[in-house]
Structures are given as structure tokens and as C-alpha cells.
């Protein structure tokens, strides 16, 4: 039975989500831009733009946590007779006859209609220009002539942009302009009732400082049935210092005029929009699945891949939840983002890996965050997150498996704290150093020291913070801290196995054997000190007491170590892995996924850190953290339980929640970081959508483990793990210049196991399809049984 549509619907053919009401539970946003010029836009045209770095190159202003929400933005004011309105319903809030917002791939179209006048604005950033376009279409659908005034509005920020020129231009004769917010709004007014719009007359104000804006007034006459179009261009031009001025005190606008010339006509704008849409069609073409399941198709083919691109661009920097002023790109975050992005634009993934490695210090520690503009580590947060170095190995291995590009290991990548070290340091050196760093920092049980935290930033076992305002992530004595992480031990085993594969290919057999031994040693340590009888312990605190154990009064079991234990291959042979997953279902399962821990913490404990400062059921304290749910999904497929893997995927999948939007609140087309758990007073509410590690890991879980097509060093592995009722599916996968058309059939209604595989009609043993000449089209038939 189709889902009830509360606020909109998926248009899969157009690759859009169509919002039919402006009053969504929270602003439902989209992103415009693919690389350098980026922006956020909501379904009511709220949002902001920046160049590369939301902190250091913010271009337009946005206010967080204001009432009403989602101000300011990219506004169009329409004055038609006695009515003033916005196509996006805000900020004037005049009730419209019709409203639609179409969020697409790098494009948002906001359309409103009132009294026979229809105004539609298409917002996008061209693929090859550092500018955003507002392409406005005005149509008179009435039987009368119309004389209207149209006002544009954007509010500039310009922080840290001393040598930049930002311009807001149009291709239409204007009736006036304003660049002063005070002049535009007037005294005691807000965005919903600006003086200039109320009086239908721009003041031609010039802002010399304080609150600069960009606004144009355009007068327009329309006959019945007539449509007119105009295009606003908001661009970023950065002049070299020596070319800043054309003459004393006059900015050199040569590059600005060159940019504007590319958008003079509707034909030029249309060509740029078509080029952008073609870019996205090509970007998503590397993996397409046909299956009798709408949630799989829309997430795997469109929205999850798109979210991975957005998350790769921004890490966790700028969203409706992240202000963009305090965080750059995360080391752990960005390495994980690569896992879901590498097949889309592998050359950008390569550059990102080298950039990340170059923020590592010579002792193996990694800056937890770095600024994309400077490519330097962010000292505000610093180092000391024990899992960070290992993610570099995971992302590098994924890149090589996808591309076969072994030259990346020889790429120069210096240490941030040793200037000039890039001359004699390679990426492979960083991978070895990452392994050594974890091995060198072990505690009394032989497990890796947790330092400030591991993947769970809020599990601060060496912090002991009792001072208001003190950061859990940067305070505490990590040098003398003795707390250990079982999860990092499991991640080490996983990373060590990846290193073994890489080194065996490089014919560095002695070192490969050594890493295999270290992986096995750590596996034994986890089984000895990290097993609690039914599940894996989470950690040991500063006093060497277990965290995530039956002996604890709260927080007896954590989700992270259950998933990673299986992914690392620990306890599979003796049933411990299966027991860990069964325990997860028994103690952590919720209707929206699995909660992070149980029982939830109900009081603050300084020896456990920030996790106990959250109310029960929220964030790291027993919410459904969707990110780590994906690890359990993958773990279930490794043990052959496709029904459970799919059940858990459905519970966290946003596409399944549109009919619950008044509870879920976040967008139904992108994954959220967290959903409030059953211990909270408001279970089922999502937070922190878009920019989350859930994006990449959910795509990996669905496409590589449930559908089962994943890159290996020597080809494509076809190893689905699906619910028994699935009869089969078709996948088109582009891999190293070859197109693989894969048909999977499940005649015996099993969950896992390849009974027979035909490659170009010929039987092939195993489940790995080998490499073919670039340009080839390969037909693969897989029979499960």
C-alpha cells in the first residue's frame, strides 16, 4: 500500500523530491554547488552561500535558532495590486493559491501562485562557475493585464573576505536598488514587511559598512498568458593582490564582467542548467539498480549517492544544524565519507586522501578537524582521538580497490608539524605510521588507549569535567589517561587486514606477515578482555573498570563494538559474533533502528564524559545513532542474515518515514545522524540530517553488502545477502572503465550464497568477476542457492 503523503512525494523520473506545503516540520533543505561555491537552500528559500569554507569565506548571512526559523535567505518579493507575497511563502507569509518546492540534484525550484500570477525561481550553481543563479519566471495566468513590482533580496556576510569582490547582478532594466539593510527594512520592521516593498520603491541606498544587502526592484508588465524571465547572478571573484584595483580605490571588475557575460540570456542560463543536470546524470550512472522495491531504487540510485557527494564536499561543516563557523572538515569524518563517494569522482577522493594525510603529525597523531581553505589542522580541537589514524587506512584501501590506482601510495604527503617533509614522505609512510601510533599507545589490557575519545566523541573516559563550559573533547589529561577502547582494537584488526592485502600486492611479504600477526594478537586481546559473555564490552575507563558490561548499572551494552567485532572477523568461528548481534536485537532494538546503548544513563558521571550529560534517549545517550546501525547491517550480511540486515536498514531509511513526518521532522530524502530513542519523551524525532557519516555507510551497507556488489583489489565481488522473499534484481555497475550488467536471481529463496555465476555466458568459479579491458561491457548472471 502506498505511503500517505503529508508534505510531498518522490519524483524518481525527475530525480526530485516535490514539497507541496511550505509548513514542513523544520526547514527541508537542499544544497546547490558541487565543489567550491556551495550553498544551502530551504523549501521557503532560506539559507546561505559560501566559497569552499563556510567559516572563512561566508558570503551571505543566515541566523540560527531564530523565530521564525529559517531567516534570511534568497527572497523574491512580488507586489501585484494590493497583494505582496513570496513564491516560497516566506517571509511575508501571504497564503498562496498554489505552492511547490522541487528539490533536485544541485537544483531547487520554488514556485508560488496567487491571483493568476505564477512566479517560479530556479536556484543552482553552474558546474564551472563560482556563482549562483536565480532564474525567475513570471507568468500571467489571468485574463487581465498585470503591472507588478518584483524585489530581490540577499543579505551579505563577507567575513574574512578582505580581498574579494562579491556582486549581485541582473540582466533586466531595474527601477532601483538597495545595498543597506536598514534602508530596505526600515525602522521596527522585519523581513516580512520591509519598507521598500511596502512602498514599492527602492531607495538606491549605498551601504558603506554594517549590514550590506543586495536588492533590485524590477517593474514588469504582463499581458494575459505572457511569461517573462530574468536572471540574478550572485558570484564570487577573488583577485590576486596585485590585480585588486583597476585604479586607486576602484575594484578591478574584469573577471566579474567575464562571469556576468556567461549569463546574459535565457539560452545561456538554460545551457548551464542542462550541463549541471548532465553532470549529475553521469555522476550517478556508476551504480544503478532495478528492483521491485521503491525504497532501494530511490536511495541507491539517487538520494543516497547525492547525499554522499554533499557530505564529501562539506564533511560536517554547514547545514541546518551545523553553523559552519566552528568546524572545518573532520579527519575521521572525511575518510569515512570517501567510502560512499569514491566511485562517483575518484580523482577528488584521491586528492582528499592526500590532503588528510598531510594533516597528520610525525608521531602519528591526527588533527581531528582541518580547514579546507588552508588545508591545515584545526588547533581549536587538536589531536588525541584514538580512532582517527586508522580511518586513513580504510579510505585508502577503498580508493585502491575502486580504481586500481596503486600510485597513490607513492604520492608525496608530508607531516603538518614538519615543514618540507613532503619531499621524502609518502602516503604509504602515513599508513605504516597510523598502525604504529595505535600499537604504541596501549593500556594495561593490551587494548588501544582511548585518549580524548574514539569514534564516539562523547565517550570521554579521561576527561573528568565538572566545570561549566569546559570542552569534553579537549580537556582532561590524555597523557596520563589509562582508559582503553575495545572498538579501536576491533578497528585496528580490520585496518591491519586491509594493510596485509595492500602489502601482499606490493610484494612486501615480511611486513604483511607482521601485520597479520599483530591483527591476530589484537583479536586475541579482544576475545580475552573485550568479551562479556553475550556481547563485546565497549571500553575500560580510567580506573580499569569495564564500560558496556553486565557489571555496569547503566550502559551495559553499546552498539559500536557489536558491529565492529563482526566486521573485524572476531568471534565468527565460535559463535560470539552471532551472540553479539542477537544481544543487539534483544537489548538495543527500537522501531526506528537500534539505540546506541542500554540502559540509558540517567545521571552525570564525570568518569564517562559527555555521553552522560545528554538526556536519556538523545544523541549519544541511547538515541538511534543511524551511523553505527549501518555497521550492524553489514555485520548481519557477513553472518548471512539478510532478513535482519534489511529489517534494520528499513528502520533507519528516511524514505520510509514521509508518512511520519510530523514525528520524524527531518527530510525524507536524506539520512539523519540521530533519531530520538524510546527513553526520550519524544521518540522518533530525527536530528542532524544531511551531513553525517550515515550517508556513506548506509550506501556501503545497501549497495555493497545487502545487494552485495563491492570492489576488491582483483575485481568485483558479487555476494548479495537479501531477504528470502526477494526474487532478484539487476545492477549496472561501472568499474575501472568497464560496464558490468549484473543479474541476480534467487530461485531457491535463500538469503546468501552464490550457487552459480556466468560471466559473458561462461561458468566461473567463486563470486569475484575479474578485470576486463577498458570500454568492455560484461554480462554477469548470478544464481543464489
Regions found by a protein language model. Name each.
Residues 329-334, 338-349, 353-451, 485-493, ...:
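Aromatic-rich carbohydrate-recognition surfaces in CAZymes
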Residues 319-328, 368-387, 416-422, 447-481, ...:
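Carbohydrate-binding/catalytic loop surfaces
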Residues 1-333, 347, 352-355, 398-402, ...:
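Anionic coordination/interaction segments
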Residues 223, 246-249, 262-266, 270, ...:
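Hydrophobic alpha-helical scaffolding
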Residues 246-264, 271, 299, 345-358, ...:
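Extended, well-ordered alpha-helical scaffold segments
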Residues 151-153, 367-369, 491-611, 650, ...:
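Catalytic cores of carbohydrate-active enzymes
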Residues 128-131, 137-149, 153, 223-229, ...:
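Beta-rich accessory regions
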Residues 106, 158, 427, 471, ...:
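Hydrophobic, small-residue-rich alpha-helical packing segments that form membrane-like cores
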Amino acid at each position: 500500500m502506498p505511503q500517505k503523503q503529508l508534505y510531498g512525494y518522490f519524483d524518481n523520473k525527475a530525480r526530485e523530491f516535490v514539497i507541496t506545503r511550505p509548513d514542513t516540520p523544520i526547514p527541508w533543505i537542499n544544497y546547490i554547488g558541487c565543489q567550491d561555491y556551495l550553498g544551502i537552500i530551504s523549501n521557503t528559500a532560506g539559507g546561505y552561500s559560501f566559497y569552499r569554507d563556510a567559516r572563512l569565506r561566508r558570503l551571505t548571512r543566515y541566523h540560527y535558532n531564530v523565530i521564525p526559523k529559517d531567516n534570511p535567505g534568497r527572497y523574491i518579493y512580488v507586489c501585484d495590486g494590493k497583494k505582496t507575497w513570496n513564491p516560497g511563502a516566506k517571509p511575508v507569509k501571504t497564503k498562496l493559491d498554489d505552492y511547490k518546492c522541487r528539490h533536485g540534484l544541485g537544483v531547487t525550484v520554488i514556485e508560488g501562485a496567487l491571483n493568476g500570477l505564477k512566479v517560479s525561481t530556479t536556484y543552482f550553481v553552474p558546474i564551472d562557475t563560482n556563482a549562483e543563479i536565480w532564474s525567475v519566471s513570471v507568468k500571467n495566468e489571468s485574463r487581465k493585464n498585470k503591472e507588478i513590482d518584483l524585489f530581490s533580496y540577499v543579505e551579505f556576510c563577507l567575513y574574512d573576505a578582505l580581498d574579494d569582490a562579491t556582486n549581485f547582478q541582473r540582466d533586466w532594466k531595474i527601477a532601483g536598488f538597495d545595498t543597506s539593510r536598514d534602508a530596505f527594512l526600515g525602522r521596527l520592521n522585519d523581513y516580512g514587511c520591509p519598507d521598500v516593498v511596502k512602498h514599492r520603491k527602492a531607495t538606491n541606498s549605498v551601504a558603506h559598512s554594517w549590514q550590506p544587502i543586495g536588492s533590485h526592484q524590477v517593474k514588469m508588465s504582463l499581458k494575459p498568458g505572457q511569461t517573462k524571465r530574468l536572471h540574478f547572478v550572485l558570484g564570487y571573484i577573488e583577485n590576486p593582490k596585485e590585480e585588486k584595483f583597476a585604479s586607486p580605490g576602484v575594484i578591478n571588475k574584469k573577471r566579474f564582467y567575464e562571469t556576468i557575460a556567461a549569463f546574459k540570456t535565457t539560452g545561456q542560463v538554460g545551457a548551464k542548467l542542462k550541463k549541471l543536470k548532465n553532470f549529475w546524470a553521469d555522476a550517478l550512472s556508476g551504480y544503478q539498480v532495478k528492483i521491485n522495491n521503491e525504497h532501494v531504487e530511490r536511495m541507491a540510485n539517487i538520494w543516497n549517492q547525492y547525499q554522499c557527494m554533499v557530505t564529501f564536499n562539506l564533511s560536517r561543516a554547514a547545514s541546518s544544524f551545523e553553523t559552519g563557523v566552528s568546524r572545518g572538515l573532520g579527519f575521521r569524518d572525511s575518510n569515512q565519507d570517501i567510502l560512499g563517494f569514491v566511485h562517483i569522482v575518484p580523482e577528488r577522493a584521491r586528492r582528499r586522501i592526500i590532503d588528510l594525510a598531510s594533516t597528520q603529525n610525525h608521531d602519528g597523531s591526527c588533527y581531528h578537524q582541518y580547514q579546507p581553505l588552508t588545508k591545515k589542522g584545526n588547533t581549536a580541537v587538536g589531536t588525541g582521538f584514538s580512532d582517527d589514524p586508522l580511518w586513513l587506512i580504510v579510505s585508502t584501501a577503498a580508493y585502491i580497490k575502486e580504481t586500481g590506482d596503486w600510485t597513490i601510495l607513492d604520492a608525496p604527503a608530508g607531516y603538518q608539524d614538519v615543514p618540507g617533509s613532503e619531499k621524502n614522505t609518502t602516503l604509504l609512510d602515513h599508513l605504516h605510521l597510523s598502525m604504529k601510533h595505535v600499537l604504541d599507545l596501549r593500556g594495561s589490557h593490551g587494548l588501544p588507549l582511548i585518549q580524548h575519545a574514539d569514534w564516539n566523541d562523547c565517550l570521554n573516559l579521561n576527561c573528568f569535567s565538572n566545570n561549566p563550559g569546559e570542552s569534553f573533547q579537549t580537556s582532561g589529561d590524555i597523557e596520563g589517561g589509562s582508559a582503553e577502547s575495545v572498538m579501536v582494537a576491533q578497528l585496528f584488526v580490520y585496518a591491519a587486514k586491509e594493510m596485509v592485502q595492500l602489502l601482499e600486492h606490493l610484494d612486501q611479504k615480511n611486513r604483511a606477515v607482521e601485520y597479520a600477526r599483530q591483527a591476530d594478537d589484537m583479536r586475541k586481546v579482544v576475545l580475552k578482555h573485550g568479551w562479556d559473555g553475550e556481547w563485546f564490552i565497549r571500553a575500560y575507563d580510567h580506573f580499569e573498570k569495564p564500560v558496556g558490561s553486565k557489571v555496569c548499572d547503566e550502559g551495559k551494552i553499546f552498539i559500536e563494538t557489536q558491529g565492529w567485532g563482526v566486521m573485524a572477523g572476531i568471534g565468527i568461528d565460535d559463535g560470539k559474533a552471532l551472540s553479539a548481534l542477537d544481544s543487539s536485537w534483544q537489548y538495543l532494538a527500537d522501531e526506528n533502528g537500534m539505540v546506541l546503548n542500554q540502559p540509558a544513563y540517567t545521571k552525570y558521571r564525570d568518569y564517562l564524559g559527555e555521553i552522560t550529560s545528554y538526556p536519556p534517549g538523545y544523541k549519544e545517550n541511547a538515541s538511534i545513532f543511524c551511523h553505527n546501525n549501518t555497521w550492524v547491517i553489514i555485520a548481519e550480511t557477513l553472518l548471512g542474515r539478510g532478513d535482519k540486515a534489511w529489517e534494520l536498514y528499513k528502520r533507519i531509511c528516511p524514505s520510509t518515514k514521509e508518512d511520519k513526518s510530523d514525528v520524524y521532522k527531518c527530510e525524507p530524502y536524506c539520512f539523519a545522524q540521530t533519531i530520538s530513542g524510546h527513553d526520550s519523551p519524544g521518540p522518533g524525532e530525527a536530528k542532524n540530517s544531511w551531513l553525517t557519516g550515515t550517508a556513506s555507510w548506509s550506501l556501503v551497507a545497501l549497495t555493497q553488502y545487502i545487494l552485495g556488489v563491492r570492489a576488491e583489489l582483483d575485481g568485483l565481488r558479487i555476494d548479495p545477502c537479501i531477504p528470502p522473499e526477494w526474487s532478484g534484481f539487476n545492477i549496472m555497475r561501472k568499474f575501472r572503465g568497464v560496464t558490468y550488467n549484473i543479474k541476480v536471481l534467487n530461485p531457491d529463496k535463500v538469503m546468501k550464497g552464490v550457487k552459480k555465476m556466468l560471466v559473458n555466458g561462461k561458468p566461473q568459479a567463486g563470486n569475484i568477476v575479474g578485470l576486463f579491458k577498458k570500454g568492455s561491457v560484461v554480462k554477469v548472471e548470478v544464481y543464489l542457492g
